[in-house]
Amino acid sequence: VSSPLKRAQQTAEAFGLPVETDERFIELSYGVYEGVKHADVPSEVWNNWRKDFGYVPEGGESLAALDGRVRAACNDLIERASTSNVVVVSHVSPMKAAVAWALGVDIGISWNCHLDHASVCRIDFRDGRPVLYTFNETAQIT
């Protein structure tokens, strides 16, 4: 399963398996702040975004909206993951939301963790519940 963005699809294709896209795993929309360094985002906007998960930057998406769509996508994968391995290729913000889902915590945890590009987070299921097995694993890219 892949984000529809080209860079994610190219990574997914490297597994040599058919790639299914799911719009819900697309990166968070930063709106007018897309590509802008954190240091260049006005402090009021940055503080609102960090404190209020429902805050929507101009032209963007709230963390609450991201969290809702990723949790729904993860819930939809539970049945398939009970009978086979499922690989999701996505982006930092959706993967942090998936980790929050697996841990049963709110999206606010995303501000307290770091994911490297091309890192792996492994979520397995035990007794029908998600269990985070690895986080930010990078051994495959060294």
Task: State the predicted function of each range.
Residues 87-98:
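A short beta-strand-loop-alpha-helix capping motif that often carries His-Thr
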Residues 5-9, 92-93, 117:
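Alpha-helix N-cap/helix-start capping motif
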Residues 17, 28-40, 79-84, 101-142:
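Acidic, low-complexity terminal tails and accessory targeting/binding regions
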Residues 1-46:
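Phosphate-coordination/substrate-recognition cap region in phosphate-metabolizing enzymes
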Residues 1-4, 85-89:
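Short glycine-rich phosphate-binding loop at a beta-alpha junction
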